[in-house]
A protein has these predicted regions:
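Allosteric cytosolic regulatory segments
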Residues: 149-156
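A short, aliphatic-rich beta-strand micro-motif
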Residues: 113-121
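Signal-transmission linkers at sensory-effector interfaces
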Residues: 1-25, 37, 127, 161-173
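Short beta-strand-to-loop transition segments that serve as allosteric relay/switch motifs
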Residues: 62, 129-138
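Acidic/proline- and glycine-rich, intrinsically disordered low-complexity segments
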Residues: 51, 65-89
Length: 173
């Protein structure tokens, strides 16, 4: 299957997840799995803004005890930089040596070489960040950057739908 077809299939799967009656945590967890498979990356993480901090909400890593416990200010780390600057960040090698890098003892981030991150924007506000990481150096393509940006936009829409669902009266049927 052509890469463009695979990308379209990924977007369709994310869109279908958005329409299912699932908890937000479950949808985000499924999205990190889909992105990890598509990009053949070693790690995919989704952080959401909560009380002015970025909180880890979904992780493709085996150690899920870090979900909800890893928190960083918008001024911290590569992830905080992406949120603060509202810009994509792609580092092809030695991401751990970037001066913006922040080490977390509970995350194996210092073992990753390549890093790709995009802000999640909803209603013109940064509401989170999605990161992918590779253990080996990797120059991300423009298509990969665009794909992750689009998934970030879909997550932004998902968060709007999730808020509406919480506020809406229950319907029959």
């Amino acid at each position: 299957m052509e890469r463009a077809e695979q990308q379209l299939r990924l977007f369709q799967r994310v869109s279908r997840l958005m329409t299912r009656d699932l908890e937000l945590d479950d949808v985000l967890q499924e999205i990190v799995s889909l992105v990890k498979d598509f990009l053949t990356c070693d790690s995919c993480l989704i952080y959401l803004v909560e009380d002015g901090e970025l909180v880890l909400f979904a992780s493709s890593d085996q150690n899920r005890k870090t979900i909800g416990t890893v928190r960083l200010r918008l001024s911290e780390g590569l992830t905080g930089w992406v949120a603060r600057e509202r810009r994509l960040l792609a580092i092809s090698r030695e991401a751990y040596s970037d001066p913006r890098f922040k080490y977390f003892k509970d995350l194996p981030q210092d073992t990753f070489e390549a890093f790709l991150s995009v802000p999640i924007i909803s209603q013109n506000k940064v509401v989170g960040v999605i990161n992918v990481q590779h253990r080996e150096p990797r120059l991300h393509t423009g298509a990969e950057m665009e794909m992750l940006s689009t998934v970030g936009e879909q997550i932004g829409c998902l968060l709007v739908l999730s808020r509406q669902k919480q506020q809406a009266p229950t319907s029959v049927g």
